[in-house]
């Protein structure tokens, strides 16, 4: 799965790609060709402690 800052190109890679939102993150899933999976964002604030 790729982690991208923008999913605009990722959703246009294949005609079966679809954008879904799960747990506050945006994913591109493609059941017919799973190598096109992608997720937007990845950096989260870590706790100091």
Swiss-Prot record:
Pfam families: Ribosomal_L36 (PF00444). Signal peptide: none annotated. InterPro entries: Ribosomal_bL36, Ribosomal_bL36_sp, Ribosomal_L36_bact. GO terms for molecular function: structural constituent of ribosome. Keywords: Ribonucleoprotein, Ribosomal protein. It comes from the Bacteria. One of its GO terms (cellular component) is ribonucleoprotein complex. GO terms for biological process: translation. Belongs to the bacterial ribosomal protein bL36 family. This is Large ribosomal subunit protein bL36. The lineage of its organism: Bacteria, Pseudomonadati, Pseudomonadota, Betaproteobacteria, Burkholderiales.
């Amino acid at each position: 799965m790729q982690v991208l800052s923008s999913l605009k190109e990722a959703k246009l890679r294949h005609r079966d790609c679809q954008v879904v939102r799960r747990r506050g993150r945006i994913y591109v899933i493609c059941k017919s060709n799973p190598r096109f999976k992608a997720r937007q964002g990845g950096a989260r604030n870590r706790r100091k402690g």
